[in-house]
Design a protein with these regions (language model features):
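Glycine-enriched alpha-helix->loop->beta-strand junction motifs that scaffold or abut catalytic
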Residues: 133-139, 199-204
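Hydrophobic faces of well-ordered beta-strands that scaffold small-molecule active sites
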Residues: 29, 82, 115, 139-141, ...
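Generic structural signal for well-ordered alpha-helices
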Residues: 102-105, 128, 163-167, 191-195, ...
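Auxiliary Fe-S-binding modules of radical SAM enzymes
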Residues: 2-14, 192-302
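Active-site beta-loop-alpha junctions enriched in small/polar residues
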Residues: 87-89, 120-122, 142-146, 182-184, ...
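Conserved Radical SAM active-site core
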Residues: 1-138, 146-150, 160-161, 172
């Protein structure tokens, strides 16, 4: 099936196996119920997928709905990290129609896998009933601003307020939550203000710097020049001259914030667990691809 719905090219495709061994630092499996993502984030690293999928359409304007053989032995994934949404958002608006992510969660019940769901949507609230049955599950929302105007410039996903509301509902349902402050835009993202909003409803507060590579570097640099011209020298220093002092200063700032609020300050995710309300673990993930190892220890590898 192929059709255009609300300006999005929708295809239904067959796949032999929905579970893919992951190359992510956390290991385990990467699971993407869709190909493509209709949030159309301007800074999305996943847009590189077009090189492998053969899509000619602009990123954010297409979505392949996967069909896969039922997972009949979920126990096979016991103890494994399963990341849902590494190069898509399983809770994109089309999930409401096709239900692929809910079907996947139903098939993983009883797996005893360590499941991480990455999203920018509040639709995940629909599946709280399943999340409770899965046990070791974490839901992470990307929130890098409290300003809806900047958010709207960057993506077409759920509003910031809806994401924060969803995080609260999931947290209060007893499910581990993450506020993923990513990407941190220099001079724009105020992570302390975000922390104040979410500290009582998340277990992890994760910081990651904006990486500019590939085709979207020009997109972002042009956006900054047009909307934030006073920040052009800073972005030139960071992304053309590769000066790291700005993010090094943010690391110091984040560590001071951790001490102020009596929060653990680590360089990678700690093993699965909950923390006292109001004291989320603060994860310093700046430049992680260069200085972090593959072990999920919570310690920096130098």
């Amino acid at each position: 099936m192929e059709e255009v719905i609300n300006g999005i090219l929708i295809r239904e495709v067959e796949t032999k196996n929905i579970m893919t061994k992951s190359s992510l630092p956390v290991g385990g499996y990467s699971v993407n119920p869709y190909v493509g993502c209709t949030h159309a984030c301007k800074y999305c690293y996943a847009s590189f997928m077009k090189r492998f999928t053969g899509h000619k359409e602009e990123w954010g304007t297409f979505l392949d709905v996967k069909h896969w053989p039922e997972i009949k032995n979920p126990k096979k994934y016991a103890g494994q990290r399963v990341v849902i949404g590494s190069v898509t958002d399983g809770y994109n608006p089309q999930e409401e129609q096709f239900g692929n992510t809910r079907k996947l969660l139903e098939q993983l019940i009883g797996s005893d896998a360590d499941i991480l769901i990455c999203t920018k949507s509040d639709l995940v609230v629909r599946d709280i009933d399943l999340l409770k049955k899965l046990g070791r599950v974490t839901v992470s929302w990307s929130i890098n601003t409290l300003g809806e105007n900047f958010k709207n410039d960057m993506d077409s996903a759920s509003s910031i307020e809806r994401r924060i509301s969803a995080m609260k509902q999931v947290y209060e349902a007893g499910i581990r939550t993450v506020c993923f402050v990513s990407p941190v835009f220099p001079g724009i993202t105020d992570f302390e203000a975000i922390f104040e909003r979410v500290k009582d409803q998340c277990d992890l507060f994760w910081l990651e710097n904006l990486n500019l590579r590939g085709g979207f570097k020009k997109t972002i640099m042009d956006y900054i020049a047009g909307k934030y011209p006073d920040l052009v020298p800073l972005y030139d220093e960071i992304y053309n001259k590769h000066n790291r002092s700005y993010f090094e200063a943010l690391e110091v700032k984040a560590e001071k914030m951790a001490k102020k609020y009596d929060c653990a300050f680590v360089d990678n995710e700690m093993p699965y667990g909950r923390v006292p309300q109001g004291h989320p673990v603060i994860v310093d993930y700046f430049y992680h691809e260069e200085i972090r190892g593959t072990e999920n220890t919570g310690k920096r590898n130098r």
